[in-house]
Amino acid sequence: ADGGTHDARIALMKKIGGATGALGAIAKGEKPYDAEIVKASLTTIAETAKAFPDQFNPKDSTDAEVNPKIWDNLDDFKAKAAKLSTDAETALAQLPADQAGVGNTLKTLGGNCGACHQAYRIKKD
């Protein structure tokens, strides 16, 4: 996932989506609480969010798949990704111990996702 390609960005978001989905299944009670899955999912989110801004190269500022607002607000964009990573690391350090804890963690992480997507994601039809 180097070079900041469109495919690399999609692959990273899919990793976060998969990890979030695994946490969501536990939070909703669709899957039993499993500390290893929670740990793995939070680790994936923390590491992937940290790497995500590196996939945006200002030299690719003509890429139609990239919202131009990212270039205008690169520090904010990076800060939003860093907050998601930090919040996932914090959750990892205080590992949610049950379904409710996973749900509360997801609310925090989901807020980070929403804030960045609202500001920077290009809506597809």
Curated annotation (Swiss-Prot):
PROSITE patterns recorded: CYTCII (PS51009)
Disulfide bonds, paired cysteine numbers: none
KW Transcription regulation (keyword) present: no
Entry keywords, A to Z: Electron transport, Heme, Iron, Metal-binding, Transport
SUPFAM superfamilies given in the database record: Cytochromes (SSF47175)
Binding site for heme: 13, 113, 116-117
A Pfam family: Cytochrom_C_2
GO biological process: electron transport chain
Binding positions (heme c): 13, 113, 116-117
Molecular function via GO: electron transfer activity; heme binding; iron ion binding
InterPro entries xrefs: Cyt_c/b562, Cyt_c_II, Cyt_c_prime, Cyt_c_prime_subgr
CC terms in the record's Gene Ontology section: periplasmic space
Post-translational modification: Binds 1 heme c group covalently per subunit.
Quaternary structure, from the entry: Monomer.
Role summary: Low-spin monoheme cytochrome c.
Protein name as it appears in the record: Cytochrome c-556
The species this protein was found in: Agrobacterium tumefaciens (strain apple 185)
Taxon lineage: Bacteria, Pseudomonadati, Pseudomonadota, Alphaproteobacteria, Hyphomicrobiales
